[in-house]
Design a protein with these regions (language model features):
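Extracellular S/T/G-rich loop segment that most often corresponds to the catalytic His/Ser-adjacent loop
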Residues: 79, 101, 249-323, 327
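Subtilisin-like serine protease catalytic core
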Residues: 32-41, 50-51, 61-166, 180, ...
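Extracellular repeat-rich scaffold modules on cell surfaces
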Residues: 290, 297-300, 307, 312-313, ...
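Extracellular beta-solenoid/beta-roll
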Residues: 453, 466, 474-549, 554-563, ...
Length: 748
């Protein structure tokens, strides 16, 4: 609802009388050129930007400088239509949706989101604040590049939003927006019924009783929120201590929380003359709503005031957050918007207040991750995406809520006893009693299921960096990709299969499960663990090395090693050490793990492990050190013969520094080592002498055989004769069994 406005026409460069002559005499108006520069918030504070003081109050320039303008995000508006001919609401981005169906009385309807005779300027003004173009003329909206879909209430702003609006019509209108793919719907439409008051909780219960147990338009709005859409509702302009029933609906239907946003309003002096957040504080923020300049039918602009003007600031800000975090769902994006808001003095909100809820959106803070985790929060970053959250992340609001829920539960138990409702409502209960009972039971059940600690789950193959100092109390799970902690976490971290923990920060504890990897540092660095750590069988501790440094884990508690592997790689390399890299590091020692509480257990292996070179671990009481050099494989273990084994044993005694020993250590495989042993054994020399002596008889025996053939008369008469004999042979050195040398030979 709007409480006042002033109008001014859209400025034009040419008067109507001179339009044709001026067009002939002057060149065409140049296309708008954006002066805003990436990384420079001040460059975005153009004259157009300054026409809406709400942009500066929410620090929208910080989002624009980060490249965030709402592009690609679909948002909706439920209001009194809009003027599609306004230059700032172009058809390329503003699209009306059509609500079609049959009213409760059987009359058919088909109503477009474009203005009709039943409408007023309200919807056009609200729509401009949502997303009017940034084109150098007039003003621009918060999410000036978003796609805006508009449904029509088919009424004006005086339309009362009590229980009487036709539920069939609103179901069709809300569903048309949801079917268009909008992620949030702005609801600034209508006025408060005169027969209700939101000043007290009893008054709110009475107002909600008008809707309870019957089909009303509120069911239509709630229906699309249960499909995942965020409904944004203005809180109302009457100055009550609480937001209206419609903006406070999750109080009565707790399952809607997370998909509902109530919005109160401020003036330029931080005054709040409108309905405060009250019972809606956990899903309520407060945005600029006084003297807001925006679009008007006919191409002009005007100032209007009220929470109707505040709500689209919040919806536009939510669209920017949605663009900033494409991997978050709607509820998560809303949580970022809420938890990065600030109180009126600019301080971050620890817990929402009855007056302003979470406070004023701070789009500068909202660009740097959530400010709090309000339960389990899963960040599912796809492969190839890397993001950084630099905000300190707490869960302090949950402490306040836990105390309030406990007090409310105790009060509800007293109510059940005092009213005799412990076994349910009596027959003949009034409408108000049925309403109160349903509200109390729903809220008590929701509180029983609520989580009062924030927790983070890193999922997906992408990478997330936490660089703030975070104090949320629940666990941190790494279920996929990389979570790099460069700030600090009070939370303990559990690394599951497919996940990797990195960073050079500090965490509360560490558990690496089978398939999980811990890779301390970003490149080479140290990860601190304030408590205990444990590596389970099948886990991996991935250590990067340079000539002078390595990754390291330093724990204040105990280290329990139940197996797993230590893998070695050069700094900034994804691959395990090559043999030549191992050779380059031979003789170096690295501290890779320290635990003040002691070390229990052993890793299974160090990889890579080449034939005679690799890494070995030295376990001390409170430290594990890595030595690069000779591994545990004996030279003789790859020998094929006793002679080779004898040579290998002799070389082993030479030790480091001897060129023969050092050369053998560089053998790439067993065959290479065996050839070296054979050459060093000298076996070939006596075997060769015997072989040559034995082979000399073959020529002698062949000549003798021919002579015997002649004496036996086998040769022919006087004719010339030829004679030849082919010889073939093979031979090899004997196996040298029992230390003897020899050979085997055969002639064919």
């Amino acid at each position: 609802m709007t409480d006042d406005h002033s109008f001014r026409p859209r400025p034009t460069s040419l008067s109507a009388a001179l339009l044709l002559g001026a067009w002939i005499a002057q060149p065409a108006t140049a296309a708008y050129v954006e002066a805003g520069r990436p990384g420079d918030p001040a460059s975005w504070r153009s004259a157009e930007y300054q026409q809406d003081w709400g942009l500066e109050r929410m620090r929208a320039d910080q989002a624009y400088a980060a490249g965030i303008d709402g592009q690609g995000v679909k948002i909706g508006e439920m209001d009194s239509g809009f003027d599609p001919s306004h230059p700032d609401t172009p058809a390329s981005r503003y699209q009306p949706v059509t609500a079609s169906g049959t009213y409760v009385d059987g009359t058919p309807f088909s109503v477009s989101g474009a203005m009709n005779g039943n409408n007023d300027s309200h919807g056009t003004h609200v729509g401009g604040t949502l997303g009017a173009s940034r084109d150098g003329v007039g003003m621009h909206g918060v999410a000036y590049a978003a796609q805006v879909y508009v449904a029509n209430t088919n009424q004006n702003d005086s339309f009362l939003f009590g229980p009487t609006p036709d539920p069939n019509y609103f179901k069709a209108a809300y569903q048309a927006l949801a079917d268009a793919g909008v992620r949030a719907i702005n609801n600034s439409w209508g006025s408060q019924p005169k027969d209700v008051s939101y000043e007290t909780l009893d008054g709110l219960h009475a107002a909600y009783a008008q809707h309870y147990g019957r089909s009303t338009w509120l069911d239509a709005a709630a229906g699309v929120s249960r499909q995942g859409v965020i409904n944004v509702f203005s809180s109302g302009n009457s100055g009550y201590a609480n937001a209206s029933v419609r903006s406070a609906l999750p109080y009565f239907q707790p399952d809607l929380e997370g998909h509902w946003l109530a919005v109160s309003g401020l003036d330029q002096q931080n005054g709040q003359r409108y309905n405060r957040c009250g019972i809606a504080k956990y899903w309520c923020i407060t945005t600029p709503g006084r003297l807001i300049n925006s679009t008007m039918p006919g191409g002009g602009y005007a100032n209007k005031s009220g929470t109707s003007m505040a709500a689209p600031h919040a919806t536009g800000a939510l669209a920017l957050v949605m663009q900033r975090y494409p991997y978050l769902n709607n509820e998560q994006a809303l949580q970022v918007l809420l938890t990065t808001a600030t109180q009126l003095d600019g301080t971050p909100t620890g817990a929402p207040t009855d007056t302003v809820g979470w406070g004023v959106p701070d789009l500068g803070r909202a660009m740097h991750g959530p400010g709090q985790l309000l339960g389990r929060f899963e960040a599912n970053l796809p492969a190839g995406l890397r993001d950084e959250w630099s905000n300190p992340i707490s869960d302090s609001a949950l402490l306040q809520r836990q105390a309030e829920d406990a007090a409310e539960h105790a009060a509800w138990q007293r109510t059940l006893k005092d009213k005799g409702w412990e076994n349910g409502l009596p027959a003949g209960a009034s409408q108000q009693e049925r309403t109160d009972y349903a509200i109390g039971m729903a809220r008590d059940q929701a509180a029983a299921q609520r989580q009062y600690q924030g927790s983070l789950v890193k999922a997906g193959a992408g990478s997330l960096v936490l660089s703030g100092d975070s104090t949320y109390r629940g666990p941190t799970l790494v279920d996929g990709g990389l979570l790099s902690v460069d700030g600090s976490l009070l939370s303990a971290v559990e690394v599951n299969a497919g996940g990797t923990l990195g960073g050079s920060g500090r965490i509360g504890g560490l558990l690496a499960r089978s398939g999980g990897t811990v890779a301390a540092g970003n490149s080479i660095g140290t990860l601190e663990v304030a408590g205990d750590l444990r590596f389970e069988s099948g886990s991996t501790y991935a250590v990067e090395l340079s000539e002078s440094a390595s990754d390291r884990i330093v724990a204040s508690g105990k280290a329990s090693i139940a197996g797993g592997n230590v893998t070695l790689a050069m700094e900034n390399s994804p691959d395990l050490l090559s043999q030549s890299q191992v050779e380059s590091l031979v003789g170096r020692r690295y501290d890779i793990l320290d635990a003040a509480g002691g070390i229990d257990g052993r890793f299974d292996a160090v990889l890579p492990n080449y034939l005679f070179l690799g890494g070995t671990l030295d376990y001390a009481a409170n430290a594990i050190r890595l030595d690069i050099g000779r591994n545990g494989t004996a030279l003789a273990s790859v020998a094929q013969t006793p002679n080779q084994a004898a040579v290998a044993g002799a070389v082993e005694t030479l030790g480091a520094g001897n060129p023969v020993y050092e050369s053998l250590l560089l053998s790439e495989n067993a065959a290479t080592a065996q050839r070296a042993f054979q050459q060093l054994s000298g076996e070939i020399y006596p075997a060769l002498a015997g072989l040559l002596l034995n082979d000399s008889r073959y020529l002698r025996d062949s000549v003798g055989e021919r002579l015997r053939q002649t004496s036996d008369g086998e040769a022919g008469g006087e004719a010339p004769e030829g004679w030849f004999k082919a010889l073939g042979s093979w031979g090899k050195s004997a196996d040298g069994s029992h230390g003897s040398e020899g050979y085997r030979h055969s002639v064919l």
